[in-house]
Amino acid sequence: MVVIRAGSAADAAQIAEVQRDSWFGAYAGIIADEIIDRVTAVDGGARVRQSFRTRPWQRMIVAVPDGEDGGIVGYAAFGPETDVLGAPWPHPLSTDGEERRVAELYALYVRPPWWSTGTGRALMDRVLARSVAAGYSSVTLWVLRDNRRARRFYERAGFAPDGATNVLTGLGDVRELRYRQQL
């Protein structure tokens, strides 16, 4: 059982550790270990602290074990849908002329020992509830095409591929798929 709370810059080092552990667990055989090591070896805590300063639209939540003094075991980052540079899109108009607000799940990572414990689902439920409360009509996310475990998780949470794809050249030319859920 975990407690979900707002993340803060004070959590940056632990959030970066969760990301590193998750990448090595989830992306083994998809992204080369040397690439994961290179990408996550930089001072992740500083990178996360910077995102709190430079991405004011981003919301971060963390999962901590209930009743334990343990550290952060998972986190999610979300906010308005972003462009390829990570800046929020202006709110595009839907086909009927009404403003369409789209949220994006930027990241959801859980330490491997906490996989299949309900931690990821608790984070996802909070992201979806907060997106509804903020007035978003749908949520998107990007997932590596070959990350079958994550794709099953997102599909069980109500997401489906919407046809958009992207190639991450800096990570060894891996393909990612965009998933979407109407709220």
Describe each PLM feature range:
Residues A6-A9, R20-W115, R121-R126, R130, ...:
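Acetyl-CoA-dependent GNAT
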Residues A12, A26-Y27, R156-G158:
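Enrichment for repetitive, rod-forming helical segments
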Residues Q14, V110-P112, E155:
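A residue-level detector for conformationally permissive "hinge/kink" positions
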Residues M1-A13, L177, L183:
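Conserved N-terminal entry element of GNAT/NAT acetyltransferase domains
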Residues I4, S116, V143:
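Conserved SAM-binding loop
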Residues H91, V102-A103, S137-T140, L144-L183:
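C-terminal "cap" of GNAT-fold acetyltransferases
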Residues I15, Q19:
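Hydrophobic pocket/interface hotspot
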Residues Q14, A122-L123, R149:
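Charged catalytic carboxylate motif
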